[in-house]
């Protein structure tokens, strides 16, 4: 192999390594999942009627995402990925098979706040069915 071939190969490898760092960061799994709203947190007025919402928990060390649906087929967030500065993307767990009850109740999924997320600034969470914002914590 001549030196120009080696330089081309090295340049190509560098591009591949650089592109590998451009994708979505690793996914994070929930630490807790339960029926109901988080305790000690007031639901925003926008959640009246069953709109999804999110809030800081444990002084910002965690956050909860509240989704509404059937108590027997509860909607849950399967994972969260950091996609940018204070930008998160969530994936939903697949709906279970079978018959679901016709009630409409809150269900909370809790995650550890990812490294690099600034809790004193607003955080945007994009879910398949909409976008939620957690207001920054006041110092």
Predicted segment positions?
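Extracytosolic low-complexity repeat regions of secreted or lipid-anchored proteins
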Residues: 89-139
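Bacterial signal peptide processing site
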Residues: 23-25
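Post-signal peptide N-terminal segment of mature Sec-exported envelope proteins
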Residues: 30-50
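Mature extracytoplasmic domains of secretory-pathway proteins
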Residues: 53-99
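C-terminal motif of bacterial Sec signal peptides marking the signal peptidase cleavage site
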Residues: 17-21
